[in-house]
């Protein structure tokens, strides 16, 4: 009986401790978040990436991260650090127009806090904690005062700054800042730039580019080891989106369908944001007949699974090209690789790998959502997350302090254990009662001389 209780107690203990947050201690946990833009998930299987594979071998891998729609750079990077869908955090595209304020946003005009204040990214939350600071090298939005706060250490964005300089700054801040940097973010433009230029199916060029990216991952690990940070620092390597192969033979020419005087294009391809200048229905009807390889949605009819309706920055009409197709004006330009398509497409998915004291070793998981990364990071850092669309339980099997089992399964195990305990208890009671049952003649009373032999 006692031994069975010992077996059951850990089950209850695991159920309780598996859902508590990171406990605080004298040494606050630290986290480095790294994004290699446009790193498609299946590059891991298609190319030899020894540094990344060694990183994964000692840590965890999520093979596919389902990102948010639209699968563009600015929106997904903000979803990673807020845990919100695009309609909630407000960065709904790389180019935007707000119908209320009449303001415009673009990759070269992104410094107005108005666009970013719809959410609080993790570097701001971390920055607000006592005796902590944040740092960032080129991560989208980190050079903007969001809610009047920037990270203690950041770099104004410039694509001309080398990875070596970015990494050098981040690791210096991590190793010698006061108050200590407990959260840092690092961004690099490749393999996205080359994916657009060559297309993901150009094996020769993409092999070369991905080798360069893999070497950069090796540089990260080596730098952290040299500085004595490797064993104590949690490191997440991920991306914002994947890449689809495009072709000059798969073009959707809007000029062949509707006159440009009827509308303005806010963002073009592969998800075009259309602001009608005439009757919305008239523009919609013309675009609906334009090309069978393009879905046309009124804002209120955008599929719910995209979570892409409830924002004044989403235009009245949205065009979504099929995978590999390009929306153009007068067939003016196209790229051999592109992204932004339906986020259910595997070609749009990035991956996630992580290493450090917060993560298991040698564990692989098939999928999580981009919005799940934020609550996981908050848990690691001991931060209270803001309301978000992510789910911590989706990532718990990646973490050493989480019980890797679903709550219904845990309840089932405990109930099963109790049933076994009940059965064993009943069996023991039955056996004991049977052992004490009266034997034959046990009721006969022996006299003092009854033990004398019957025969002399």
UniProtKB/Swiss-Prot annotation:
Zn(2+) 1 binds at residues 37, 73, 240-241. Disulfide bonds join 257-290, 397-404. It catalyses: P(1),P(3)-bis(5'-adenosyl) triphosphate + H2O = AMP + ADP + 2 H(+). Zn(2+) 2 binds at residues 192, 196, 339. The chain crosses the membrane at residues 411-431. Pfam families: Phosphodiest. GO terms for biological process: blood coagulation; positive regulation of blood coagulation; purine ribonucleoside catabolic process. Its main location: membrane. Substrate binds at residues 94, 157, 192. Its EC number is 3.6.1.29. It is a single-pass type I membrane protein. Glycans are attached at residues 148, 169, 279, 330, 389. Belongs to the nucleotide pyrophosphatase/phosphodiesterase family. Hydrolyzes extracellular Ap3A into AMP and ADP, and Ap4A into AMP and ATP. Ap3A and Ap4A are diadenosine polyphosphates thought to induce proliferation of vascular smooth muscle cells. Acts as a procoagulant, mediating platelet aggregation at the site of nascent thrombus via release of ADP from Ap3A and activation of ADP receptors. This is Bis(5'-adenosyl)-triphosphatase enpp4. It comes from Mus musculus (Mouse). The lineage of its organism: Eukaryota, Metazoa, Chordata, Craniata, Vertebrata.
């Amino acid at each position: 009986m006692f031994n069975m209780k010992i077996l059951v107690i850990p089950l209850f203990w695991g159920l309780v401790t598996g859902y508590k947050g990171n406990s605080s201690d004298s040494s606050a946990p630290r986290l480095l978040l790294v994004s290699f833009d446009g790193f498609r998930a299946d590059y891991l299987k298609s190319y030899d990436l020894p540094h990344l594979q060694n990183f994964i071998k000692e840590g965890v891998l999520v093979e596919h991260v389902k990102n948010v729609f639209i699968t563009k750079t600015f929106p997904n990077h903000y979803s990673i650090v807020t845990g919100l869908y695009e309609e909630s955090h407000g960065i709904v595209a790389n180019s935007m127009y707000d119908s209320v304020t009449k303001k415009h946003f673009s990759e070269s005009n992104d410094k107005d806090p108005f666009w970013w204040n719809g959410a609080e990214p993790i570097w701001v939350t971390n920055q607000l904690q006592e005796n902590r600071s944040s740092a960032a090298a080129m991560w989208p939005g980190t050079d903007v005062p969001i809610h009047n706060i920037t990270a203690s250490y950041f770099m104004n964005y410039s694509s001309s700054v080398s990875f070596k300089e970015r990494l050098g700054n981040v690791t210096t801040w991590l190793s010698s800042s006061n108050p200590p940097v407990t959260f840092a973010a690092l961004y690099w433009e490749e393999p996205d730039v080359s994916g657009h230029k060559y297309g993901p199916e150009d094996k020769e060029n993409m092999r070369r580019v991905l080798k360069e990216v893999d070497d950069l991952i090796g540089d990260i690990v080596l730098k952290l080891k040299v500085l004595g940070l490797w064993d104590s620092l949690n490191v997440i390597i991920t991306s914002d989106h994947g890449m689809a192969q495009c072709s000059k033979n798969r073009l959707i020419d809007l000029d062949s369908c509707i006159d440009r005087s009827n509308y303005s294009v806010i963002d073009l391809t592969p998800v075009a944001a259309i602001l009608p200048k005439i009757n919305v229905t008239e523009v919609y009807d013309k675009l609906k007949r334009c090309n069978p390889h393009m879905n046309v949605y009124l804002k209120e009819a955008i599929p719910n699974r995209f979570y892409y309706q409830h924002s004044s920055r989403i235009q009245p009409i949205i065009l979504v090209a099929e995978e590999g197709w390009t929306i153009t004006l007068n067939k003016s330009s196209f790229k051999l690789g592109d992204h932004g398509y339906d986020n259910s497409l595997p070609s749009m998915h990035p991956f996630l790998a992580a290493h450090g004291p917060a993560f298991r070793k040698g564990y692989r998981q098939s999928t999580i959502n981009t919005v799940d990364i934020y609550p996981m990071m908050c848990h690691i850092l001991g931060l209270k997350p803001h309301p978000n669309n992510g789910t911590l339980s989706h990532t718990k099997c990646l973490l050493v302090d989480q019980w890797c089992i679903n709550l219904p399964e845990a309840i089932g195990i405990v109930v099963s254990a109790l049933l076994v305990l009940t059965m064993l208890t009943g069996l023991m009671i039955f056996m004991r009662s049977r052992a004490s049952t009266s034997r034959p003649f046990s009721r006969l009373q022996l006299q003092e001389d009854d033990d004398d032999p019957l025969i002399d």
